[in-house]
């Protein structure tokens, strides 16, 4: 016998919360349709990229684009479940990645500076035991 888990016992990973997805999608159908259309375009574009065509300097642009798409999809998934606060937490790093990507596209010399900054950050962070 199947026992449907409830929000009271299993929170947002419950069967009941999954069923609530239809309610949110119906209530905000225009927004979800637009979000999915935008996501579809982004996924198709990134799918057209060929790793063999990406030289080392531009590889970071490819990776940042993937990170942006994944963050965008995470926001959609969280919003479907009515998890507004966690979705909002992802917006800032998504925007930071978008601004970084735009800056790197405009000035390819920033790619080297970006890697240098990442190296410095790793050196400063305390190492776990």
Residue map of PLM features:
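N-terminal, Lys/Arg-enriched amphipathic/low-complexity engagement segments
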Residues: 2-64, 69
């Amino acid at each position: 016998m199947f026992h449907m888990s409830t929000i009271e016992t299993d929170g947002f990973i419950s069967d009941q919360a999954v069923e609530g997805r239809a309610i949110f999608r119906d209530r905000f159908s225009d927004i979800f349709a637009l979000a999915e259309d935008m996501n579809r375009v982004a996924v198709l574009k990134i799918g057209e990229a060929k790793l063999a065509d990406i030289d080392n300097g531009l590889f970071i642009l490819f990776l940042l684009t993937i990170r942006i798409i994944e963050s965008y999809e995470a926001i959609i998934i969280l919003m479907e479940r009515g998890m507004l606060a966690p979705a909002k937490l992802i917006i800032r790093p998504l925007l930071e990645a978008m601004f970084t990507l735009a800056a790197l596209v405009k000035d390819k010399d920033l790619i080297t500076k970006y890697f240098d900054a990442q190296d410095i950050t790793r050196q400063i962070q305390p190492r776990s035991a």
